[in-house]
Amino acid sequence: MGKQVYLHIFNAKILDVFNQRFEDTELWIDNGSIYFRGKSKDLTAKNNFNAEGNYIVPGLIDAHLHIESSLLAPSELAKLELRHGVTSIFADPHEIGSVSGVSGLFYMIQEARNTPLHIHYMLPSSVPATNFEHAGAVLHADALKPFYGFPEINGLAEVMDFPAVANGDPDMLEKIRDAQAAGHHADGHGAGLTREQLAVYRAVGIDTDHESTSGKEALERIQAGMKVFIREGTVERDEKSILPVVRKNNQSYFSFCTDDKSAIDIQKEGSVDNNVRLAISKGIPAERAFTMASYNAAVAQHVKNVGALTDGFIADLVIISNLDNFVTEKVMTEGNWVDKLESKVTTFTSPAVNAELSLNDLKLPLKSDKAHVINIQPEHITTKHTIESVNRDQQGNFVADQDYAKIIVAERYHNLGHGLGIIHGFNMQEGAIGSTIAHDSHNMIIAGVDDKPMIIAYDRLKRMGGGMILVDKNGFTRELPLEIAGLMSDKPYQEVIAKQKSLKGAFAKISKGIDFDPFLTLSFMALPVIPSLKITDQGLFDFDQFKFIDINA
C-alpha cells in the first residue's frame, strides 16, 4: 500500500465483534478512523504504540441515559464516563427540557462540544410527559424539528406517552415522523406494556425499549422486532433478571444502558463497564458482552461506522488488562488518546423556583384511618399501591411516623398548587428530605415525618434556586445546590460526589435499614407514567386506572 498513517498499535489481542473472537493483530489509525486492521509490511506510521499484550475492545456505548440524573453537567459527566471506557452516550435531555424548554436543549448541545466524549442527544418526546403534572415548558413538534439540523441530534427520545400514540395524537405522530424524515429513529418506553400494546409502538416505527424488567418482557420485545437496552442504573437494576435469556442466536438484539445513575455509583462501580462485568460474571462470554456494549448499541441507535475495530470505523477504543474483572487502562476517541481533561462547565441561567408552601399546606385530613399509600420498591422506580391503616390526630389529620411519611409535590414554575400524600419505605425516624428533581416535570418534592423540617426544606430549596436537601429534627441541613435548572451542578464532579455522600450519610442517621439511594428514589415518586401509585403536583395518581384518586380509602 505504501501509505503512512498517524498511529500503529501492535502487540494486542483485539476484539472482532463480527466473528466474536479476540485476535492477535494490529490497528493502523489515520484521520480519526481505523485505516486497516491486520499486520502489514507496506504501511508505516508516524507514531507506534506497544499495547504490551493487553486486550483492546471498542469504546463502550451507553445506549440510553439521562445526564441530569448524575447531577453533573455534560462536560463533567464526560470525565467520569471516559475514565470507565465509555466513549459514546445517547442522552435524553428530557429533564432540562421539562424545566427550561428549548434554551435547555441548546445548553446541552453547547456543553457536549466541550468534551471528547461523543454525546448524541435524542430529543425529548414528551414535555410535559403527560397532562397529569405541570412542567416548566411545552415542547411541541414544531419546536423540536429545527434541532435535527444539529449533528449532535440522533433522533427522538423514549416515547413514554403510550395513550398519545395509541389514540393517534397528531403532535406525537408528527414528532415521530420528523425524526424519521431526518434519517433518524424513535426510542421507546414500554413500561408495563403488553405484547399487543407493543404492536402499537411498532406500527409507528418505534424500535427500541429499555423498560424490560424480566427475561419474559425482553423476549416479547425482541419478538416484536425491537432492540432491548438492558438497564443497570442506580435505582432500576434489571440486568440479572434479563441476562438468562441472552443467547447466541438473539444477542444482536441486546445492548446496555444505565438510564439513571448517580455520579457516586458511576465512580464506585462504573458506568456501562459495570454492565459488562456483571454480564461476564453471570456467564456471558466476554466477546459477546463487549459486543453488546459497543457494536450492538451503535446498530440499535442507527449510527454507522461506530462500535467495531476494523477498516473504516471511528477509532474509539479501550485498552484493558484482563477480561473477567477488567479495569480501563487507556481510552481513545477518534484516534486521540484521552488524557487529562480540563474543560470548564458552561454557565446557564435557570428559572426561579416559584412554589409557595406553609405549615397549613401540610395538613392532610382523612375521613378514616384507611388511606391509599405509596410503597417504595427498593432498586426499582415502580411502587406498590396499598391501602393501609394510618394514625390520625384528634382533628382527623394524618400523623406521620416511622412507617408512614408525608410526601408533597409543589408546582415550582407558576405556583399552581400541590399534591399531598402518604409514602411507606423511607423508614425515616425524624426530619425531611427534599429536591427539585422530580421526574418528569421536576417540581419540588419533599418527604418527611416532621412538618417544620419539611417547611425548612422548602424554604432552602427555593432560596438556593433548586437542589437537594436534608433537614433533621433540629433544623440542621445538608445541601447540594444544583445551579443548572435545579437539576445539575456547575461544580467539578469530585465536589458534587462529596456533597452527595454527605447527604447520604446524613440520611443514614435519620433513617433505619435503608440500602438504596433515597434522593434518586424520591425523584421517581412523581412519575405517573410508571406503575403503580405516584404523586404529582395535581394529586395522587393511580397508574392502573390511569387517573387521579382520592387519598381516602
Curated annotation (Swiss-Prot):
It comes from the Bacteria. GO terms for molecular function: adenine deaminase activity. Its cofactor is Mn(2+). The keyword DNA repair does not apply. It catalyses: adenine + H2O + H(+) = hypoxanthine + NH4(+). The keyword Chaperone does not apply. Its EC number is 3.5.4.2. Transmembrane segments: none annotated. Disulfide bonds: none annotated. GO terms for biological process: adenine catabolic process. InterPro entries: Adenine_deam (IPR006679), Adenine_deam_C (IPR026912), Amidohydro-rel (IPR006680), Metal-dep_hydrolase_composite (IPR011059), Metal_Hydrolase (IPR032466). Keywords: Hydrolase, Manganese. Belongs to the metallo-dependent hydrolases superfamily. Adenine deaminase family. This is Adenine deaminase 1.
